[in-house]
Every structure is written in structure tokens, then in C-alpha cells.
Swiss-Prot record:
Predominant place of localization: other
Subcellular location, record wording: Spore coat
Keyword tags: Germination
Functional summary from the UniProt entry: Involved in spore germination.
Origin: domain of life: Bacteria
Gene3D superfamilies to which the protein is assigned, alphabetical: 2.60.40.790
CDD domains assigned to the protein according to its UniProt record, in alphabetical order: ACD_sHsps-like
Record has Plastid as a keyword: no
Gene name linked to the record: gerT
Full protein name: Spore germination protein GerT
Amino acid sequence: MFDWQRFFPFQQFSKDGLKNADPKDVEQYIHHMMKSVFGPGYAVQFPFRDPLSKETSAADESDPIDIFETTSHVFVKIPLTKEQLNLLKIKHTSQTLIIENYPEKGRQEKVVLPSLVRRKGTKAIFKDGILEVMFLKNEDFNLSEIDITF
């Protein structure tokens, strides 16, 4: 009888091969792959993260920028000194806030917003050492009907 198993290289991925796999090893492998594809601060790019995860990214620890949203607005709070405020320039696209000369001169910080925002109507107020940027959400009510074929 011919030994077919010798020519079947995928046996390592069979159910028996995965029975002894440690879930933590699998999770570490996935984190390693995600970091290699999306970069070290990849976790902030995804809206649904594990709240019980003990691993915090370097961006979360060093980033004092606070982002939250309401039904009609997106708010970004940035702690600043008056000296930083004089050098600061802020711009935005429909999904990203770009802060120039922050946290130090010559650097640029990009903040991904949790939802799309309008081009006009953005306001920025500096009070008590905090710059608060308020965006109007872009409400997209465009519906498209999809034909079902069968």
C-alpha cells in the first residue's frame, strides 16, 4: 500500500495538531502579526478592543489626548501649555485630526476620529490648559437599494 501521508504536508494543521495549542500563544502570534502589518500603535486604529486586556500600547501610555463622541459631535481634548499653543497648528480631514508642532516643535500628531466629521463648523477653544476641538458629525443618510438575484 502506498504511503499517502508522506505527500500530505498539511497534517500539521489538522484538528489533532491544534488540540494542544495554548490560546495565549495564539493571541501573542496574532498581536505580533498585527504589529508587523499595521505598526506598533495598531490597537488605536480599531474601535473594538478588549477592555480587559492587560497589554497597553505605547501610544496609549504616552498619549494624553482624550477623544469622545456624542450623537451629534466628536470632541478631542488636548492638554497644552501656552507656549505650545502659540506654535500649534491644527487641521483635519473627514476622519483625522492633524496636530502640528505637538507634543514638541517639529513633530506632527495624527488622531483618528471615531466617526466621520463635517468639513465646516469645527470649533477650537483653549481654557484651563486644555484645547478642546469640537467637530460636527457628518450624518450619512444615503441609502442604496440592493438587488437580490437568485
